[in-house]
Structures are given as C-alpha cells and as structure tokens.
Amino acid sequence: MDPIRTSRLRAPLLASALLLAGSSVCAAEPDLETELRLNAMIGDTETAAELLDQGAHVDAPNQFGKTALMFAVEGDDLETVALLLSRGADVNARTVAGCTPLTFAAEAGHIGISALLLERGAHVHDRTRSGWDALMIASRHGITDMVEQLLFKGADPKAADREGRTALMQAASKGETGVLPLLIEGGADLEARDKQGATALLIAADQGQAGAVETLAGLGAQLDAVDALGSTALILAVGHGHVAMVERLLAMGADPNRQDRKGTTALMEAVATDHAELIDRLIAAGARTDLKDDADRTAADIAVQLGHRQAIARLAPKASKTP
C-alpha cells in the first residue's frame, strides 16, 4: 500500500487534517513528515509505521513545533504513541509554546499515555513558556487521576508559574475541589502567594468559587488572609458581587470590618456598586457603618457621593445613630 495515497472515504477528513499537520494548501502532495503527523493525528498506526520505514523523520515538527508524537498523545492513541517511542521519538520534545507530550497528556487526561511517557523518561518538571508544568495543567482541569499519578512520579506541588501561581492556585481558580486535598497531601503550601500577594483561597474568592473557598478553609487556609493591596476574601467577593460566596465567608467567620490598605471595607465595596442585598447581609453580620477610608469617608459618605439611592436608604438612618 502506498502510504501517500488516501482512500476516497477518508479524503474529507484528511484534507482538513493536513492543514493541522502542517501541509501547505498549495502543495501538490504532502511530504513524508506531514503524512506522518497526519496519520498520528487520525490514529493510523499501520500507515505511520510504513512512513517511518520509508524514511520519515520521527520528530519532524510542524510550524508550531508539534511532532507526530504530540498529535498521537492528543488523540489518546496508545498504539501509535508506543510505535513512535519505539522508533526513537523524543519524549521531551517541545512546541514553540514550550508544550511537551506530557503536558498534552495532562491537559487531556490521558492517564494511560502519560504513564507510558513517564516510563519512557518524560520530564515531570518541564514547563511551558507560561511556566506551567503538567501538574499545574492537570490541577487546573481537575483531573484527579492525573494529579495523583504526577505527584507519585515526583511532580512538585510547590512549583509556581510566571505569575507565581501554584497547582493549588490553578485548581482553586477553577473550583476543582476534588484536586485540592490531593495537592495538600502531596505537600502543597496552603498559604503560598502569587505575584499579587494572593493565596489560593483569595484567588478562589475572587473567582467566585465558593466550594473551593470552603474546601481550602476546611484544610486550614487562613480565612482573613490579605493580598498585596490588603484585600480579604470577603472584600474581593463583595467587589465582584458574589452573593453565595459572601454568605459562605460570613458563615465561616470572615471579619466584615477588615480594611484594605486604602481603608476600604467590604461594606464600602457593596456601597460602591449599590448592591442592596450585600449591604443588608453585611450589616446583619455586624459590619460597622462608622469606619472611614483613607479619604475620611464612611460607607454612607460614599453612597451620597456616588448617588446610590439603595445604599443611602439603608445607611443614612444608621449613620445618624452613630455616636
């Protein structure tokens, strides 16, 4: 069989796949390497083997740096992955963006393929250009089996990306609660901070991930930790209007009267957006109306300044009773 020839049945699939594999739309026919990547992509192990026998370079990349092995990994094609590795494919090859076969497997959750890659020498600590390793990627997608496998193989749960974010922070930002205990058991630092001074709990609060906040607090994370600007989880949640998050934080004992570096309280944040429901909940939880920010303004002053009628209606009577 001529591996360059394609059947009529597969022609529509191959035509679109050729572009992904790296073939020029103007080419009369793809070269051996493009055909290899293509067949790795569609899972044709037999044809891939014949192309290699004809001299196709196993690690030839497309314009984005993707090799046949990476395409096979993405397609969850264990047979083709095994073939390419047996023919000398670089298990640690990198794309232009720094992705490796292992990071592709981690993102897709292909646990069997990642096991084979690791067995063949895949570097568990390799990073993409964004600074993400396979553990961060698997954690972000909540793939518990992959996280367990990578931790067992020595992945570092304390490693951070270019923004200073760890695998725990990645999972927290997406609300992947099932991954969080695994990372803590594996040695992740609950109170590690990114470049903005935020902990995993603060990141979860900022993203409205109430379940993640509750899980992290249950694991021992500080509820009233502050970021570089002095904001607490409660202040961040109020600022984004995350009602369910605010309710949980208050129920867990978050202090409604903490102030950030500019003196802003959670109540002032609620007033700034004229969020009546949050104003009521914060006041009911003991938020003080007499606290002032660095501009010497109370929450009522801010409400009047902004012309927020709902806030004024709720705060004016209370402000007048303040001694």
Curated annotation (Swiss-Prot):
Pfam families tied to this protein: Ank_2
Keywords assigned: ANK repeat, Repeat, Signal
Range of residues in the leader sequence: 1-28
Entries under InterPro entries matching the protein: Ankyrin_rpt (IPR002110), Ankyrin_rpt-contain_sf (IPR036770)
Domain of life: Bacteria
Keyword Protein biosynthesis found: no
Ranges for the ANK repeats: 31-60, 64-93, 97-126, 130-159, 163-192, 196-225, 229-258, 262-291
Matching SUPFAM superfamilies: Ankyrin repeat
Protein name: Ankyrin homolog
